[in-house]
Amino acid sequence: MKFEAVVRTELGKGASRRLRHAGKFPAVIYGGEAAAVAIELVHADVINQMDKPEFYETITLVIDGAEVKVKPQDVQRHAFKPKVEHMDFIRI
């Protein structure tokens, strides 16, 4: 499973809200030797794949042309809407 991701330049509550209104959501990749990276993902691409068991195994994120293998660590969902608010990924 492969998703396109973009490194976030704006961080914080307001920037995250703007992402969500634009049909995207914030995420972070951490673990391993490299530093943590804040990214943004397209909500429709991810939410359609979340009900598949393969989603919770290994995922490949393409960030600026580089492929990073990750595993979902935590998912924060909206309280009553079927939306993802934020995700944490751990490097493999």
Swiss-Prot record:
The keyword Zinc does not apply. One of its GO terms (biological process) is translation. One of its GO terms (cellular component) is cytosolic large ribosomal subunit. CDD domains: Ribosomal_L25_TL5_CTC (cd00495). Keywords: Ribonucleoprotein, Ribosomal protein, RNA-binding, rRNA-binding. The keyword Ribosomal protein applies. InterPro entries: Rbsml_bL25/Gln-tRNA_synth_N, Ribosomal_bL25/Gln-tRNA_synth, Ribosomal_bL25_short, Ribosomal_L25_dom, Ribosomal_uL5_bac-type. GO terms for molecular function: 5S rRNA binding; structural constituent of ribosome. This is one of the proteins that binds to the 5S RNA in the ribosome where it forms part of the central protuberance. Belongs to the bacterial ribosomal protein bL25 family. HAMAP family: Ribosomal_bL25. Part of the 50S ribosomal subunit; part of the 5S rRNA/L5/L18/L25 subcomplex. Contacts the 5S rRNA. Binds to the 5S rRNA independently of L5 and L18. This is Large ribosomal subunit protein bL25. The gene is rplY.
